[in-house]
Amino acid sequence: MSPVESSNVEKDIFRDTPVRFLGKRYANEVGEAFRSLVKPVVVKFSYVVAFGYVAADSVDKGFKESKKPHANDTEKAKRVAIIAVDTVLWQTFASVLIPGFTINRFCFFTNMLLEKSTKLPTNLRKWTVTALGLATIPFIVHPIDAFVEDAMNKTARKVYNY
């Protein structure tokens, strides 16, 4: 995209700005990283926050689409539904399920490795796992986003012609 084209494209606050990193989009990954140190209800709440982010982005995208001109009300309703569903799917996989699973398994196996190969005290081991889990989050973002984008282009988006 040329600089002129990119300046005409509206910035998506839910995908293209630091809002993603302010505890909303990645709330559940942070919850997963802290799993060994907090009560299960805290981890569950982190998923509530993450799904709240998914809902907010979906409503935002649907609302913006509803404000655009359409040939008729039927076409408008169809486009709004497609945009909202596409956003729910993309955000659920790219922001909640895949990253949450990735950090959960990373922390689980890191804990196992440290438990078997070191003599770290339990509390230090748990904090080390949490720190490593948190440090991993920035490295998984873009590969997961690209994977989900590609997977959706090859599957769901073909179904609803997005």
From Swiss-Prot:
CC terms in the record's Gene Ontology section: mitochondrial inner membrane; mitochondrion
UniProt entry tagged with the keyword Transmembrane helix: yes
Compartment(s) of residence: Mitochondrion inner membrane
Transmembrane segments: 36-56, 81-101, 128-148
Major site of localization recorded for this protein: mitochondrion
UniProt entry keywords in alphabetical sequence: Apoptosis, Membrane, Mitochondrion, Mitochondrion inner membrane, Transmembrane, Transmembrane helix
GO biological process entries: apoptotic process; mitochondrial fission
Family, as annotated: Belongs to the MTFP1 family.
The name this protein goes by in its record: Mitochondrial fission process protein 1
Organism: Caenorhabditis briggsae
